[in-house]
Amino acid sequence: MNSMDRHIQQTNDRLQCIKQHLQNPANFHNAATELLDWCGDPRAFQRPFEQSLMGCLTVVSRVAAQQGFDLDLGYRLLAVCAANRDKFTPKSAALLSSWCEELGRLLLLRHQKSRQSDPPGKLPMQPPLSSMSSMKPTLSHSDGSFPYDSVPWQQNTNQPPGSLSVVTTVWGVTNTSQSQVLGNPMANANNPMNPGGNPMASGMTTSNPGLNSPQFAGQQQQFSAKAGPAQPYIQQSMYGRPNYPGSGGFGASYPGGPNAPAGMGIPPHTRPPADFTQPAAAAAAAAVAAAAATATATATATVAALQETQNKDINQYGPMGPTQAYNSQFMNQPGPRGPASMGGSMNPASMAAGMTPSGMSGPPMGMNQPRPPGISPFGTHGQRMPQQTYPGPRPQSLPIQNIKRPYPGEPNYGNQQYGPNSQFPTQPGQYPAPNPPRPLTSPNYPGQRMPSQPSSGQYPPPTVNMGQYYKPEQFNGQNNTFSGSSYSNYSQGNVNRPPRPVPVANYPHSPVPGNPTPPMTPGSSIPPYLSPSQDVKPPFPPDIKPNMSALPPPPANHNDELRLTFPVRDGVVLEPFRLEHNLAVSNHVFHLRPTVHQTLMWRSDLELQFKCYHHEDRQMNTNWPASVQVSVNATPLTIERGDNKTSHKPLHLKHVCQPGRNTIQITVTACCCSHLFVLQLVHRPSVRSVLQGLLKKRLLPAEHCITKIKRNFSSVAASSGNTTLNGEDGVEQTAIKVSLKCPITFRRIQLPARGHDCKHVQCFDLESYLQLNCERGTWRCPVCNKTALLEGLEVDQYMWGILNAIQHSEFEEVTIDPTCSWRPVPIKSDLHIKDDPDGIPSKRFKTMSPSQMIMPNVMEMIAALGPGPSPYPLPPPPGGTNSNDYSSQGNNYQGHGNFDFPHGNPGGTSMNDFMHGPPQLSHPPDMPNNMAALEKPLSHPMQETMPHAGSSDQPHPSIQQGLHVPHPSSQSGPPLHHSGAPPPPPSQPPRQPPQAAPSSHPHSDLTFNPSSALEGQAGAQGASDMPEPSLDLLPELTNPDELLSYLDPPDLPSNSNDDLLSLFENN
């Protein structure tokens, strides 16, 4: 049997032992804590251990909620494993998800109140002074009770998994329980559980008296301190954690380094070598360590990796020391480590530097004294280390690979010395002398048991800024804010980024990003399980990571621009559903294909909208009962309810979604069976982009406007006899007075528009109209109250020309005669004064005939609207997707000028890529296609009722519209060129109405029953006629992976039958 087989066998034997202990309430906590530590390393989830691990987890899922066991700890354990479900077989992964959700539900019910009582500002790792004192060793040596005491640097058991504990940093796991590296046998190399012979483990055994202290030895005997002799449970270390730079005393894994004789921060002499246990196993582990080093370096820690990749800040810390390279999240120590004296060189730099002997063996160097590059000023005072260094040759340099940045819970490990305070230049390789030496307790571990250190419940402010190695945000909560002044090594250039607030306090205890956790009401002081910054929810780094530093994820400029909301055809992901009566917590799962997730992240105009509405509201206006709280993937979301029931806003989830499985957890304190919930894909173009699209596609040429006005004159004369258009009695209608003020804002119209079916000449301001319909759009003309859906709007070039001609004057009205000649009506103080044609006014303002007018330059106007789609040089406003965007150059996503996409148009995909239909209009497919598609009249009467449907609130109805028209905005669709194309706007959702598109094709597929939209979740119930549930399938998309293809109804029906929903993996 080779060493690896032996290691596997020993590990499985240990797991079997833990399984037995998990069934006993007296040993459950210790056993679960050890297992949680072990699961902190991704290697724990290798197939050779799966069967044994699942046996343990099966027991946890069964007993955790029983009396005498620890539900919170059991949930965290399952959550950590569930976050790595991709490493399990499908069957095991399904069991994990189910267990995790079940325990999460029970945990919420049991601890909801208590969680909210935690003070919000409390740092996760700050134990109260009293607790620190209680941590005093009960054994003969100071570390006696270490293993299970809640040491300052350990996480409290009741701490949400979101907060990372010290032990977590290297392995990238959040060990939320009080697991300690030292106390935890898992850190002991002797322990078979060290997969791959944890690099740390090796020096820990024989050479490190500190680790092998009786306590460790005792691991084989029984839990020291806490576990009385009567307790047989043996806690063995499973995966020791690698050293933390500069953490001078973490026994095995920290600066003291596994090898450090006094690894626990206790003088070596206090721990007799006699304590060494299983030297042979240790040796084997050490041997494996070298082999595992490579794997370790590249391994990705569940949480840590996510954090890292998410912000990409820490891809690597620049070389900290001449020899230091941080490559992976695990510090791989290359080979067996001999006893490294606890000497001050544990800091990363020193480790990398090779731990010069002088630094190692001599007494700790003063902070101000120069020291060899490799020696860390704090070397000696690592956590819990006595201030002196114990001489001990440091066998070799331990390159620290990639030190993970600390999480909020673990403020700083080593490296404290580098910071502005420490005078270490931020430059990577050098750490000039820092401040005067002082016993550095590692700020992070309050109350460390360092002899010289006062045990304060808090993390003493580090003298140095760790900024350069750690993200400042992590230290937000602490008084010592690390300015992060220099991540000098931060390759990412995050360097002086102001610390992001650590939302820690608001995150409910949620063990793993992907797992639903009982949502604590936002505001609870529980730190997020995963990340200090709510950045990352997805447990696995998505292809494209949205950077969501703020709870509401909106894209960067998301708040800068107003957006319209239109449901996308066949875009219902979770059909409208009710909650079970009196069910306090319910989980609703949906899946996103990686390609769909990527597209959502790329396009700022696409969103996953989750809303609640009253079951009797046909318009499906958003209405959230006061008792409802929503959490997605364990991230609580804030619901905007506004001042009244008409101002409620739907939730947008894409920023908290992840590829694959996603869980929406709804918590209610009172029954809300009268409401329905629906999750759907919506198109949210910015008002600006819609304006640009309308200008390009729905500009009614002056000659058409004139024809329409003349027709109105004749029809009015015929229908109302001698009544003028304005309703005035007169001989014969010789002129019409038209106000230049918008009936919505009562200000001068900037861009005159009216609905396609409107018979009046009076216009309203297009931008004001779009803004009016942003939230709960009714899409009704403010002049005649007829339905004026987005696709049916027309920009009147003739009126626009009049406005331009007198833009610098203060006229409020103009008169237009039957020949369409016009002149301004002077503002009269005396109403009795007639507007005599021969009078001064007439002389000053001549009547202008259409032929004399200079029409406005549409392209200039479009460009003036700002970042337009590619067609125009200006990039569209980030927040909005200009129709241009879509149209942008026809198909180019124009760099997403309007999108918030961080990457711009991802992959350079052109809009075309997304749209199947050929762009019919001059503007690429966007509008035109959709519009055209839209154009085809929808058959559903509902649409009329739903004109607003276009609005976000009426997603379904709008969906209808949106469906066919999925991107009205993107299409700017209304702009379809067919000015005359009679739209069936009323029936069609706003976007489809006019489009002459019909002419282009009457996609019947576009039609889709609003109700169906409502219910048809993936829709595809298919029949647009079906009352509610059915959604029309999209015309076949040639490439179902092109999420957007479904968005724009193609000009030509495609032959593929994929519905949008097909893009979403349903359970």
From Swiss-Prot:
PROSITE patterns: ZF_SP_RING (PS51044). This is Zinc finger MIZ domain-containing protein 1. Zn(2+) binds at C758, H760, C781, C784. PANTHER family: ZINC FINGER MIZ DOMAIN-CONTAINING PROTEIN (PTHR10782), ZINC FINGER MIZ DOMAIN-CONTAINING PROTEIN 1 (PTHR10782:SF7). Pfam families: zf-MIZ, Zmiz1_N. One of its GO terms (molecular function) is transcription coactivator activity. There is a cross-link at K91, K834, K843 (Glycyl lysine isopeptide (Lys-Gly) (interchain with G-Cter in SUMO2)). A zinc finger (SP-RING-type) spans 727-808. Changing A287T: In NEDDFSA; uncertain significance. The gene is ZMIZ1.
